């Protein structure tokens, strides 16, 4: 089975490639991006290439690209959450500052949520944001997540403690909100 590609009306979510490193660096050297999500500003193209190899190359991580361009504008993906003991997916995302306010992230997240619930058979998906990241909170609310709890967490890359708010969305809650398919899976 090949890599999963998700398509929406405006976006193609595809696997990251090492040749995306210069573009990733251009997006992630911005101090408004990484620290808001809990990671450091990228300092070089080589560092971005290593992030692609070690973090973004997972099977459930996608580069967000516009339909008319191969260049990534951000990223969306799933990891195992720390919100609960049993393994459940947690949705994460970011987008470059030049693409803020265009609803690309909610659109990408909706495609990943549909994939989670209809193709992977997940029962619940988590999402979280640091308390001072209001943009992320708005994305989470647009996608229908419900608040669950807030806790203090140590953010290792930034060497600081932050308050993190956790949200969850069950497959039943998601079904109430969605009746049509907004993406296609390519393999």
Question: Model-found features: residue ranges?
Answer:
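Conserved GNAT-fold acetyl-CoA-binding loop/helix
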Residues: 32-53
């Amino acid at each position: 089975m090949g890599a999963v590609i998700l398509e929406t009306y405006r976006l193609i979510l595809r696997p990251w490639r090492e040749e995306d490193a210069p573009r990733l660096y251009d997006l992630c050297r911005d101090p408004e991006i990484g620290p808001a999500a809990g990671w450091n500003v990228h300092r070089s193209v080589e560092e971005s290439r290593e992030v692609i190899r070690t973090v973004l190359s997972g099977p459930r991580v996608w580069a967000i690209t516009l339909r008319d361009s191969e260049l990534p504008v951000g990223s969306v993906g799933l990891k195992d959450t720390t919100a609960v003991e049993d393994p459940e997916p947690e949705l994460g995302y970011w987008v470059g500052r030049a693409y803020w306010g265009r609803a690309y992230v909610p659109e990408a997240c909706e495609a990943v949520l549909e994939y989670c619930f209809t193709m992977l058979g997940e029962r619940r998906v988590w999402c979280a944001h640091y308390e001072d990241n209001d943009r992320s909170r708005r994305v989470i609310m647009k996608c229908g997540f419900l608040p669950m709890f807030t806790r203090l967490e140590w953010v290792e890359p930034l060497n600081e403690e932050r308050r993190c708010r956790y949200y969850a969305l069950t497959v039943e809650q998601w079904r109430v909100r969605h009746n049509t398919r907004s993406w296609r899976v390519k393999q």
